[in-house]
C-alpha cells in the first residue's frame, strides 16, 4: 500500500470560449482515470495559439458559468492573472511544491499529444505529472516515430498506475466524439450561425450580452 494522496487533475486551455467539448470530455476522462476533481486552468498568454485570446475576465466569467453544474470541476486562476506566457512546466513545478504527495494528472486532447514534443522542456513534464489524453474527432494524423516510442515507454492500460506513482505515465481515455472547437464557435458566431449544441446556455447568453466574437472583436 502506497502513501500517496488522491490524484489531482489539471486541464489547461484558453477556453475562448469554453464549450461542451471541454467540459464533457474532461468529465468522462476523469471518470475513466479515477480522478475525483479537476482544476480548470485558464491561461492568460497562450504559447501554442496563433490568435490573441479574448479578455481574460470574459473567459474566466464564461468558465465559471460553464462548470456550475459540475461539482468535480473547479478553477485555478494562477495562470490567467499572470503577465507572462503560460508554460506548463512552470505551473507543474509550482503545483508539485504545493501537492508533494498527490499524483498530478494533466489532461490534454489528442491534438495536444501530437504537439507535445514542441512544448517547453517537454521531457521534464513527466517528472511532475501523468498525462491523461482525451481523444478528439478529426485528429487522425499518424503518430511520429518519437511519439510512438514515448507511448511504448509510458502508456498504461489501466488507471491504477496513475494512482500508484506521482508522475510519468500516459493514459488514453475514450472520450465522447464531440466535434466542437472554440475556433468553430467563433466562426459560427461571427457568421450568425447557431451554437446551441456547443455551448452551455449561460455561456451563450453571456456571449450575446457582452457582444463577444463580433466582426470588430480581435481574436
From Swiss-Prot:
Enzyme Commission code(s) on record: 2.7.7.18
GO molecular function: ATP binding; nicotinate-nucleotide adenylyltransferase activity
Chemical reaction(s) catalysed: nicotinate beta-D-ribonucleotide + ATP + H(+) = deamido-NAD(+) + diphosphate
Domain of life (superkingdom): Bacteria
Pathway linked to the protein: Cofactor biosynthesis; NAD(+) biosynthesis; deamido-NAD(+) from nicotinate D-ribonucleotide: step 1/1
Keyword Transmembrane among UniProt keywords: no
Pfam families with a match to the protein in the record: CTP_transf_like
Family per record: Belongs to the NadD family.
Record function comment: Catalyzes the reversible adenylation of nicotinate mononucleotide (NaMN) to nicotinic acid adenine dinucleotide (NaAD).
Protein name: Probable nicotinate-nucleotide adenylyltransferase
Native species: Pseudoalteromonas atlantica (strain T6c / ATCC BAA-1087)
Gene name of the encoded protein: nadD
Amino acid at each position: 500500500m502506497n502513501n500517496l494522496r488522491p490524484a489531482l487533475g489539471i486541464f489547461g486551455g484558453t477556453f475562448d470560449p469554453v464549450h461542451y467539448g471541454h467540459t464533457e470530455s474532461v468529465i468522462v476522462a476523469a471518470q475513466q482515470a479515477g480522478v475525483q476533481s479537476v482544476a480548470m486552468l485558464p491561461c492568460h498568454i497562450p504559447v501554442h495559439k496563433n490568435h490573441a485570446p479574448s479578455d481574460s475576465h470574459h473567459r474566466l466569467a464564461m468558465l465559471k458559468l460553464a462548470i456550475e453544474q459540475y461539482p468535480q470541476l473547479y478553477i485555478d486562476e494562477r495562470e490567467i492573472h499572470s503577465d507572462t506566457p503560460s508554460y506548463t512546466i512552470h505551473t507543474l513545478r509550482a503545483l508539485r511544491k504545493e501537492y508533494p504527495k498527490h499524483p498530478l494528472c494533466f489532461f490534454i486532447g489528442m491534438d495536444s499529444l501530437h504537439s507535445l514534443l514542441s512544448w517547453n522542456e517537454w521531457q521534464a513534464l513527466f517528472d511532475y505529472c501523468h498525462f491523461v489524453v482525451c481523444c478528439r474527432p478529426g485528429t487522425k494524423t499518424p503518430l511520429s516515430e518519437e511519439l510512438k516510442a514515448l507511448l511504448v515507454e509510458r502508456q498504461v492500460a489501466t488507471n491504477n498506475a496513475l494512482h500508484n506513482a506521482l508522475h510519468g505515465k500516459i493514459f488514453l481515455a475514450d472520450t465522447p466524439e464531440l466535434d466542437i472547437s472554440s475556433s468553430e464557435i467563433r466562426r459560427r458566431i461571427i457568421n450568425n450561425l447557431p451554437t446551441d449544441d456547443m455551448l452551455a446556455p449561460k455561456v451563450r447568453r453571456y456571449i450575446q450580452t457582452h457582444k463577444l466574437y463580433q466582426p470588430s472583436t480581435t481574436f
